């Protein structure tokens, strides 16, 4: 009704039937595009995907510690089989760097660190040192997941309660995603 009124005021041709058909097509397209995809880049909400999601947070911080504090997440995709993590970095990782990253992630898994969720304002989250995905749009109130004394990120979850639930972390591939962006694919083994 509001749209019809605005169209009349602005002398714009409006067909309610065409509008409803367009809206229905758009909704179907949106459903298709987002099928099996949550906002957090997760393919589903399974235990395996949840574990890999938590491992992604460990990986992100390990990259920042081993390579550079300037590293920013550029995207992720997590399925029950593997995680894919894109990050800002301008060169191929050496085998020594990959080993250090894997070792650090596995060390944090073995330390049995608690994963704690807090809700806070976006401003407070950034002031507290929480990392966020570059270019992401966040609501005013956000969830922040902290992996005890290691990682702190704005995230919608879900996560395990403790890193000991994860198993052994292993990078299976490191490659270029695009100019200035690297991609890591990794798995968790029992």
Q: Can you describe what each PLM-predicted range is?
A:
Residues 1-190:
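A glycine- and charged-residue-rich anion-binding loop/surface
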């Amino acid at each position: 009704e509001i749209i019809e009124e605005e169209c009349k005021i602005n002398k714009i041709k409006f067909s309610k039937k065409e509008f409803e058909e367009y809206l229905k097509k758009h909704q179907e397209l949106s459903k298709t595009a987002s099928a099996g995809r949550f906002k957090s880049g997760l393919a589903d909400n399974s235990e395996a995907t949840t574990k890999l999601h938590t491992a992604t947070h460990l990986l992100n911080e390990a990259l920042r510690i081993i390579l550079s504090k300037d590293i920013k997440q550029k995207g992720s995709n997590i399925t029950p089989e593997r995680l894919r993590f894109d990050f800002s970095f301008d060169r191929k990782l050496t085998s020594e760097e990959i080993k250090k990253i894997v070792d650090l992630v596995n060390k944090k898994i073995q330390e049995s660190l608690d994963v704690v969720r807090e809700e806070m304002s976006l401003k407070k989250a950034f002031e507290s040192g929480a990392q966020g995905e570059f270019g992401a749009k966040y609501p005013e109130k956000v969830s922040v997941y902290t992996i005890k004394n290691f990682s702190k990120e704005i995230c919608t979850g879900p996560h395990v309660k403790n890193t000991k639930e994860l198993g052994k972390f292993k990078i299976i591939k490191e490659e270029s995603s695009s100019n200035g962006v690297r991609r890591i694919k990794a798995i968790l083994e029992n």
